[in-house]
UniProtKB/Swiss-Prot annotation:
Entry remark concerning the domains of this protein: The presence of a 'disulfide through disulfide knot' structurally defines this protein as a knottin.
Main localisation: secreted
Originating species: Cyriopagopus hainanus
Name of the protein described by the UniProt record: U7-theraphotoxin-Hhn1c
SUPFAM superfamilies for this protein: omega toxin-like
Paired cysteines (S-S): 51-65, 58-70, 64-81
GO molecular function: ion channel inhibitor activity; toxin activity
Signal peptide residues on this chain, from the entry's feature table: 1-19
């Protein structure tokens, strides 16, 4: 009887250690994935856009992209980039 209880307790201890190892590995993988996402995001931000996106706020110092035009749209109190009915050339 003592041997069976000892075996069960030992098995539970082994499962606890393995579970802790898997959680640590999963957490490290999650952190690595998050770091990769932030790295990709930072890389895309470094590619400076010289124009504003669709429905983005525009001014003289913030022009719209080639296929967009800056228009005043009521009731919005600022100018936004809207489609100029043209397509960008590649």
């Amino acid at each position: 009887m003592k041997t069976a209880i000892f075996t069960v307790v030992l098995a539970l201890a082994v499962f606890a250690v393995l579970s802790f190892g898997w959680e640590a590995n999963e957490k490290a993988l999650s952190e690595e994935f998050t770091e990769l996402i932030h790295e990709k995001e930072a890389a895309s931000e470094t590619e400076a856009r010289e124009c504003r996106y669709f429905w983005g706020e525009c001014h003289d110092h913030m022009p719209c992209c080639d296929w967009l035009v800056c228009r005043y749209k009521w009731p919005i109190t600022y100018n936004i980039c809207v489609w100029s009915r043209t397509f960008p050339e590649k």
